[in-house]
Swiss-Prot record:
Keywords: Cell membrane, G-protein coupled receptor, Glycoprotein, Membrane, Receptor, Transducer, Transmembrane, Transmembrane helix. This is Mas-related G-protein coupled receptor member F. The chain crosses the membrane at residues 45-66, 83-104, 124-144, 161-181, 199-220, 242-263, 274-294. Residues 318-343 are annotated as: Disordered. Orphan receptor. May bind to a neuropeptide and may regulate nociceptor function and/or development, including the sensation or modulation of pain. The lineage of its organism: Eukaryota, Metazoa, Chordata, Craniata, Vertebrata. It is a multi-pass membrane protein. It holds the Pfam family 7tm_1. It comes from the Eukaryota. The gene is Mrgprf.
Amino acid sequence: MAGNCSWEAHSTNQNKMCPGMSEALELYSRGFLTIEQIATLPPPAVTNYIFLLLCLCGLVGNGLVLWFFGFSIKRTPFSIYFLHLASADGIYLFSKAVIALLNMGTFLGSFPDYVRRVSRIVGLCTFFAGVSLLPAISIERCVSVIFPMWYWRRRPKRLSAGVCALLWLLSFLVTSIHNYFCMFLGHEASGTACLNMDISLGILLFFLFCPLMVLPCLALILHVECRARRRQRSAKLNHVVLAIVSVFLVSSIYLGIDWFLFWVFQIPAPFPEYVTDLCICINSSAKPIVYFLAGRDKSQRLWEPLRVVFQRALRDGAEPGDAASSTPNTVTMEMQCPSGNAS
């Protein structure tokens, strides 16, 4: 197999690693394919401006989520997850914005190259962290809805914060190992190891994380459907969890197809690199919109504060009008539990 352009570009001798590849394409290279199997045409010049505009909009949205979920809204187990998810998405979008900004100008020298390499490493780490948080959110939400009494009685204190810390640590370790084999060992010494790391990352993302986020969502949908037959209104938090998982699955289709076709059938990628990266940026930018749409009160014609909208998106249980005929509201149960359980 010829030289592999891994998830992150090689730190030295880039021309040898990716001969004939334009700088723009090299920056947007996702890395699953060898140079012989990716298109040599660079992305359109307008792509950099689209990336920058999308990243800036996503940074504003995730910044609002960080502010309201972190300082303005009472902490709940799931607001902790969404807080870390917004942090991962915000840092990822910032790294992509830096790369797009460098791509738009003629920045030469060692310092811009160093910034590009650091931005790629940070982007990979935060992308992995954001994806790994989705299974944790899906599983915990599924358990809290299907087994509410058991969940709130047995739930360890500070579970959300502990899980988020472990997932960030896992992301840091995986990214460090990947960059050790694909960047610091040198291209000649790390070719096979870097290739195996790319395969391992794909297996981890598509064959472990995706099932772990999809199966709990399916169980949640079945449970919500059963409640709908009893005329019980579903919690808005269920809609939020299902929506953010669906957005990720849709936005990662192109990346998954490219990876699957190449590693299973040895078929070149049918989609340009910048298309898959654009979809991932859309995924990172869309979550604040999901929170807003889920928390918006359709009957409220006047403008509502964003704090109220985001707080309503975290509503866990039936609407007030249905409280008498619904199962125990997990928000009420949360208020009855020690404050440490909301961490």
